[in-house]
Structure formats: C-alpha cells, structure tokens
Amino acid sequence: MKRISILGVTGSIGTQTLDVLRFHKEDFELVGITANRNIELTMDIIKEFSPKYVAINHEESYKKLVDLVKSEGLKCEVIYGMEGLVKVATLDEIDIVVTSVVGMIGLKPTVEAIRKGKNIALANKETLVVAGELVMREAKENGVKILAVDSEHSAIFQSLQGNAHNKIDKILLTASGGPFRGFTIKDLKSVTPERALKHPKWNMGQKISIDSSTLMNKGLEVIEAHWLFDCPYKDIEVVVHPQSIIHSMVQYTDGAVIAQLGVPDMKLPIQYALNYPNREGNISEKLDLFKIRELTFEKPDLDTFKCLKLAYEAGEKGKLMPTILNGANEVCVELFLNKKITYLQIPEIIEECMNTFDYNKEVTLDNVINLDKEVRQYIYEKYN
C-alpha cells in the first residue's frame, strides 16, 4: 500500500485524485492533506479518508477547522500556513506527494519534499517553471522520481517508455486551442472573465482556465517539458489539436511518431502517476475510436495569443526570467478575474515586467521567492 499526501486537496486535481483513491481503496492510504478556504469540503474529506495531518493556508479557515475538528472529536492534527504545507509534504510515513496546489505556493513544499526523498506526482507546473533547474538537480541528487500529472507531460513520458532518449527529434505538445481558438485580436478586446472560464474540453479551476484561454498554460507546459525531458526549446513544438484526444506525441530521429491517446479525463494521468510503473483498472471512460470522426491539427497563432510566445522567450532566456513571467501572469489573471484589467492587458503587463526586472541571477529558492514578490508588488501598485 502506498501512503500519500495531497497538496491542494479541494481543487480540481485534488478532488479527482480522491476519485482515484476511492476506486483503489486497497492500494492507497491518505496520510496528509492541505487546503485553503474550502473548510466544508475539507471536513467531508477528513471524515471519509481520516488523514492524520491537515494543513490550512488561510488563517480564518484554519481557526474554523480547528474548532470543527475538536467539536466533532476527529483525530487529526491541524497545522497552519507554509509550515503546515511543508510538514504535510515531508511526513516520514508517506511515499509520494501529489502537488496540486495552484501557483508559486507549491514551490517550497515541493522542494522540501524532494530533499526528504519523497517521489512527486507533479500537477503544480509553476514549480518547474520558476525553479526547474533547482528542482531537477535536487531530484537527481536525492534519487526522487518526478511523475507529471499534466495530461500532456504524462503522454510524453508514456511515449518515451522503451525508447532511447537521445533519439528524440522533437516533442509535439498538443493544445486544445482554448475557448477563443480562431479569434482575432479585435475579437479578444471584448472577452470577459465569464467567457474565458468556459473551456471547451476540460473542467478546471479558474486560474488554469484563464491560462488555457490565453495559451499561457501551454507556454508554462513548454517550460515544464524542457525541464522534465531535458529537451531544447527549439525541439518542443506546440500543435493545436481541438479534439483533445491525442494528449501529446514524440517524434524520433527515424521519423516515427509515438502518441498517447485517451478521453480528456485528468483521472487517467493522475492514476498513471500514482501507480507507476504499473497500470491498473480505471474509473474513466475508455476511448472508442469509432466515435471519433476526425483528428485535426493546426499551428498556434502566436501573434494573437502572445502569452505563448512570451513563454518561449522566457524559457530561452532562462535564469529567473520564467519567475518573472509566472509571477506577472498569476497577478494578471487575478486582476482580470476581478475586472481590474482587460483580457488583452494580460500579455502586455507580462511583457512589461519581463523588460523591467533583472533576471540574470542564480536560481536559488530565496532568489526565486524574492523576485516573485517584487514582480507581484510592482503590478499591484501600478494596476490594482
């Protein structure tokens, strides 16, 4: 039996991970969880799975949960803040950590978990975006496996199995194109948060839904793929595939292209990461090839969806430039959702930050965290 912690248990990936655990009750024990504000769902999870440790990152919610746990006589330790997240990620008794928190907050607990020798099922792509060099070095030094939970990176990983890594010609990273595929810049001027949150294929949280609409999500995945698979940026090609059936592909030097196909359901890559290297039965719908009428592919429009272009530029420049890109994007998404900035201002402000801040510093935990704070403060003061 594998013992696991889930960081971000009440979010989209967290709750789908719980679905996998319910289906494989004999295979996993949930030891630790973290959440932010959703105390009602957290209480339901505590009652169902009986985790020993619960970390809450929101102060009022933490106090409320402490009282609820005590009043109902539940046996779990409730911990507050970043200290709590790190504790849940580094528990001696766990084997694997599912990092499904959104944003920079996942960096420190993930790095500390790696230093403790815990395998990582990584759904928090920002960790590799802002500190890929540091994270992959730590993983190698500590003998830790980093198993991608993103459907695209899971597909690439599966397509690499049994093949020589040095025979890769290119990675073909698929993208649905988001809800605004085919739009012009003029069309995007009137985009509202409500429209941007409606993704055509995937059910996701707010932040990743906006990122998917701007193609920043794909840009972050390009940087993530660079670090996970040690692949130059010039050999990572984004392919728009609206049906979201092919989750990504690897083209080899002999011309062969190996792909992983499946229904668009995050429980598939979650389960693959948790069970690796084994394959087990799944609660998800199986792919019916006879129901697929067509598989189409097109190039992304980098002039209209500038965030993807900016992500490639940040990745190529390296050092702390991806930290600037990520921090600026997180704040811009928040401001857009709160209707403080327009949709088209998102790439404009990100580019402004990339041209404003010094990125040419060593990638350390402190440097990443400090620069991230500077970028966020700059945007809040100017645009909030």
From Swiss-Prot:
Enzyme Commission designation: 1.1.1.267
Keywords noted in UniProt: Isoprene biosynthesis, Manganese, Metal-binding, NADP, Oxidoreductase
GO molecular-function terms, A-Z: 1-deoxy-D-xylulose-5-phosphate reductoisomerase activity; manganese ion binding; NADPH binding
One GO biological process term: isopentenyl diphosphate biosynthetic process, methylerythritol 4-phosphate pathway involved in terpenoid biosynthetic process
NADP keyword on record: yes
Pfam families named in the record: DXP_redisom_C, DXP_reductoisom, DXPR_C
Pathway annotation from the record: Isoprenoid biosynthesis; isopentenyl diphosphate biosynthesis via DXP pathway; isopentenyl diphosphate from 1-deoxy-D-xylulose 5-phosphate: step 1/6
Residues engaged in binding 1-deoxy-D-xylulose 5-phosphate: K125, S151, E152, S176, H199, S212, N217, K218, E221
Listed name of the protein: 1-deoxy-D-xylulose 5-phosphate reductoisomerase
Family: Belongs to the DXR family.
InterPro entries per record: DXP_reductoisomerase, DXP_reductoisomerase_C, DXP_reductoisomerase_N, DXPR_C, DXPR_C_sf, NAD(P)-bd_dom_sf
Cofactor: Mg(2+); Mn(2+)
Organism annotation: Clostridium perfringens (strain SM101 / Type A)
Matches recorded under Gene3D superfamilies: 1.10.1740.10, NAD(P)-binding Rossmann-like Domain (3.40.50.720)
Binding site residues for Mn(2+): D150, E152, E221
Binding site for NADPH: T10, G11, S12, I13, R37, N38, N124, E126, G205
The keyword Repeat appears for this protein: no
Catalyses which reaction(s): 2-C-methyl-D-erythritol 4-phosphate + NADP(+) = 1-deoxy-D-xylulose 5-phosphate + NADPH + H(+)
Functional note: Catalyzes the NADPH-dependent rearrangement and reduction of 1-deoxy-D-xylulose-5-phosphate (DXP) to 2-C-methyl-D-erythritol 4-phosphate (MEP).
